[in-house]
């Protein structure tokens, strides 16, 4: 018997009775509506456990029973949520994912605020110190003001904006080596060590386009639409320059020139929608061959300088992958024009140093952080301003997330979630494979290879085991020094630690158990070079997964997430990688053409969706849309298979929905959300995902079983005559 049983049993009864009454009232309203489902369970028992009652109440509270499910299922499933959940002033987007993230943040906050003696490892104590440095418990950040940045500017050679710069001895080569290879900052291009697409057991240096401050190239090129953003960007740059000692008029003039330079970069970048063919992007060449094409720097000297971090030599014959050779060639022409004059060189240095300054201002005093509010408002429609502890929890998770993960898992992750999730994944994999036999557009040989690839997909669930071993966890962060009163310096050290850790992978075989997300993350991912799907502990919670919920709800929410990630192995990019994660052609030509024809249907379908008269980019979102559609179908068929093998679950009280209908409602309600106009615009320009509404109505309108369950007439919006089907 629990010590506090009598106290809580009374609360349980009261809450239960209240929810049951609420259900009866709301269900009466629901059944009075013209589009309510037929009475399905008139004379049978209902599930009246606490989990079932709360689940039913949640489903009802999110719905808009006045909407027609056959016209707009998103409104039907989520209209109540949207009505009851205005976007908080500090947010640009508000929805199920964000709410769950905030719950996870609270768990982490409570753990981080424990005394040092409660932590299990040195890594966890470092996380606590970092969190305290972010919160600035001793007012060190405010006392120091701009000093940490001014000290850094001296170390990296000065900045003309603040007047402590001489062009006399400046060189682009030296500046890039200092900023990128010592401080891990950005500018002009990006590079990193990653898995080799064509030989996924090995690591290789990868070079790509990059170097913009604003989120998309469109922000620079669509001047009419983005004039507000560009004006806010210039204002932000000017404020930062003045805070660092520059004279306002002079700072504004010089920063305008930096924006013009960034605009030149934006013009030569390929849009994301044109970078979806991995075969075409991959260009493996020796380092000296890179030198022959865009010689604005000495590439061998640059990477030799980088390798000094790990005392490794690099040959001119070292193989690297260049994903944007045309960009580098065009960049060479731009650099040549700017380095021909003294003013041009000053602009180049101003740009490069700005890339460092803007990435570090959030670690300075409040005046610097406030300077960003105007630009944030222009970009996403909100100035931000969340509580410091929330910001610092997120920041600490980004920096030392596997130590945070150990605390989170001990506090909030239930052990039985892992085997249950594993079982669900296997059922969805089986359903996906079974469906391959029905695909008449796929030849037999490619189908057999696809089945082998599906079987070979590995999964990681919850968290990596090593994080609960203090000695192993400490090894990961042993080279990272964290001090309580050095927030700015902590982040300089984090940058160097991350750079060194990345470089050290170069001569190591690929570790297929390395996680790319921290355990508290509310998300999931697929890695094509590992042929692997990963589901962190953070998402294996209600409303995505709850052991007390009916299987229909768990398959509809978490099951579709699992099916989505699995289907990424066969989207327009994932399909180019074989079962071992290697990029090569393993499909029959005729099957490739049939696949492209079917994916064009998806491109056209989503390109016809609009938000505020702006079209969804069907090409840019193709991979995610394929995964959404395939994931829904695989999860639904897996649920049907589960339903056939198991005793029938009791219906939820007050709903009069079948469990098949509950599956679709649970799927849709995961995406209940609202965004500012600015955030939607940015999403349409940048995000590979379609807006939430279309992630619901797109896949459902393509799945005949949905229309059958909700009795949608052929030709209605949710049951179009012409449907798209890939997997």
From Swiss-Prot:
Amino-acid positions noted as binding Zn(2+) in the UniProt annotation, renumbered to this chain: 564, 568, 624
Broad class of where this protein is predominantly found: membrane
Cellular component, GO, one term: plasma membrane
InterPro entries attached to this UniProt entry: MetalloPept_cat_dom_sf (IPR024079), Peptidase_M13 (IPR000718), Peptidase_M13_C (IPR018497), Peptidase_M13_dom_2 (IPR042089), Peptidase_M13_N (IPR008753)
Name the UniProt record assigns to this protein: Endothelin-converting enzyme homolog
GO molecular function: endopeptidase activity; metalloendopeptidase activity; zinc ion binding
Tissue expression from the record: Highly expressed in brain and midgut, and to a lesser extent in fat body, ovaries, testes and haemocytes.
Cytoplasmic side: 1-44
Transmembrane segments annotated in the record for this chain: 45-65
Gene3D superfamilies reported for this sequence: Collagenase (Catalytic Domain) (3.40.390.10), Neutral endopeptidase , domain2 (1.10.1380.10)
Similarity comment: family membership: Belongs to the peptidase M13 family.
Cofactor(s), names only, from the UniProt record: Zn(2+)
Residue numbers annotated as active site: 565, 628
Domain Peptidase M13 residues, every copy: 46-727
Glycosylated residues in this chain: 138, 160, 164, 169, 222, 309, 337, 340, 511, 589, 608, 656
Assigned keywords, A-Z: Cell membrane, Disulfide bond, Glycoprotein, Hydrolase, Membrane, Metal-binding, Metalloprotease, Protease, Signal-anchor, Transmembrane, Transmembrane helix, Zinc
Membrane topology classification: Single-pass type II membrane protein
